[in-house]
């Protein structure tokens, strides 16, 4: 299945278009299946999208929405590095969503303490609770993600054990190339069970990785190449990030 590409003049325009599209996609998912399962991401574009979505909050029946995370820094709950904390400031504190439908990953000062693997397993078990019988994860309606200049997505970095994982849906990451070193991440297995995967990428520094991912590079070396949805794979790019896409 080929990916779809939308190119925007700048990152601000890209984020606004993504927010509008996400609000509409949530509405469609609720109409079709009575709920929407969305995987959030951090980073400048991911948090910018959440700020935009907060302005569209009245368009969405939040009582039918479940929010998950693609990855998280395994740091204390109130640490500013937490994707969850940034999401609360940008979106969650401004909408009327039932707390039981917000599913953050465990924090480093939580019940699992230093046991990163137990924390990852607990999140994997949580995902299974929302899946159809016999399946390890639900079919997320949208998995949002950014991409690093070397092609990493979530906390799946090039040529690491996590990006090569073939059975687990969620794993712990130690010695991350990007600080902080300890993280929890959904694997490519989980990502690929999403109906739609959206990659939001901006900036010249990421143009080479965008071109490599879209050109069929191995996912072990360019993890974004493995970010493929069951129905839709959508690249939302600014002109700088799109500059090296072939033809």
UniProtKB/Swiss-Prot annotation:
Q: Which reaction does it catalyse?
A: 6-phospho-D-glucono-1,5-lactone + H2O = 6-phospho-D-gluconate + H(+)
Swiss-Prot/TrEMBL GO biological process terms: carbohydrate metabolic process; pentose-phosphate shunt
Enumerate the GO terms in the molecular function aspect: 6-phosphogluconolactonase activity
Against PANTHER family, the record matches this protein to:
6-PHOSPHOGLUCONOLACTONASE
InterPro entries xref list: 6-phosphogluconolactonase_DevB, Glc/Gal-6P_isomerase, NagB/RpiA_transferase-like, PGLS
| EC class name | hydrolase
What organism is listed for this UniProt entry? Answer: Mycobacterium leprae (strain TN)
The record's disulfide annotation reads: none
Instruction: Name the lineage.
Output: Bacteria, Bacillati, Actinomycetota, Actinomycetes, Mycobacteriales
Q: Please explain the role this protein plays, according to its UniProt record.
A: Hydrolysis of 6-phosphogluconolactone to 6-phosphogluconate.
Entry coiled-coil feature ranges = none
What protein is this chain from?
Answer: 6-phosphogluconolactonase
Gene3D superfamilies the UniProt entry points to: 3.40.50.1360
Family recorded in the similarity comment: Belongs to the glucosamine/galactosamine-6-phosphate isomerase family. 6-phosphogluconolactonase subfamily.
